[in-house]
From Swiss-Prot:
This is tRNA pseudouridine synthase A. Belongs to the tRNA pseudouridine synthase TruA family. GO terms for molecular function: RNA binding; tRNA pseudouridine(38-40) synthase activity. Its EC number is 5.4.99.12. The keyword Isomerase applies. It comes from Bartonella bacilliformis (strain ATCC 35685 / KC583 / Herrer 020/F12,63). The lineage of its organism: Bacteria, Pseudomonadati, Pseudomonadota, Alphaproteobacteria, Hyphomicrobiales.
Length: 247
């Protein structure tokens, strides 16, 4: 038995999320099918983060155990060839042979996410499924200042899905930066782990600050209320990217 670490990139627009689901097109299902086509084994891959439908990744990490100790280039080339043949918008960026002690989910110490907002009057013609389009002008500086109220260890009940299965709403948010680059606004988030819909909830609430409807104090009060009803709208999945996992 040999364990391998896979680093993946994918456009989540046409997938029902990462997790394998019967009769639905998922990222996990597509990669496991590629593994079966290559090795003849029905294997389950373990991932660092189970992204939702429509969410993208540029640095997703997974691990898989093969019976045979294949050369990493053989795995890399074979999986990408099958994914390309099947028309999947998934790429294996890197394959590494790793110790059995490595676990893509449990060994992760930090997860990095990016949320992209296109802030202009004209709608996106090319990247409609890869950004959140907001035509109303946003004050990115105000959004960034307000976002700092969320950094640190908090009960994030306000900013998690009502269907979140995490045992505790307490998380330590290490970074939440907001930066404008031309017509785009980028939200950068980093933590050991996140709650379901947490970053999309941040994005929707910070949008309220950006248009001037909320102040930084309003955002802070929403956090301390620990009440899902106090959250702003949940931003669409199209703008969210898992960019990196640290071990």
């Amino acid at each position: 038995m040999a364990r391998f670490k896979l680093t993946l990139e994918y456009d989540g627009s046409n997938y029902a999320g990462w997790q394998r689901q019967a009769e639905l097109r998922t990222v996990q299902g597509a990669v496991e099918q590629a593994i079966f086509h290559f090795s003849g084994q029905q294997l389950t891959i373990t991932t660092a983060g189970r992204t939702d439908a429509g969410v993208h990744a540029t640095g997703q990490v997974a691990h898989v155990d093969f019976e045979k100790d294949w050369h990493v280039n053989t795995i890399h080339n074979a999986l990408n060839a099958h994914l390309r043949q099947q028309g999947d918008n998934i790429a294996i960026l890197n394959v590494e042979n790793i110790p059995d002690s490595f676990d893509a989910r449990l060994s992760a110490v930090k997860r990095h996410y990016l949320f992209k907002i296109l802030n202009r009057r004209a709608p996106p013609a090319l990247n409609a499924k890869r950004v959140w389009w907001l035509p109303r002008p946003l004050n990115a500086d105000a959004m960034h200042k307000a976002a700092q109220k969320l950094v640190g260890k908090h009960d994030f009940t306000t900013f998690r899905s009502a269907h979140c299965q995490a045992k505790s709403p307490i998380r330590t948010l290490e970074c939440l930066d907001v930066q404008r680059e031309g017509e785009e606004i980028f939200l950068y988030a980093r933590a050991r782990s996140f709650l379901h819909h947490q970053i999309r909830s941040f994005a929707g609430s910070l949008m309220e600050v950006g248009i001037g409807r909320w102040t930084a104090q309003d955002l802070e009060e929403a956090l301390h209320a620990k009440d899902r009803a106090r959250c702003g709208m949940v931003a669409p999945p199209s703008g969210l990217y898992l960019t990196q996992v640290d071990y």
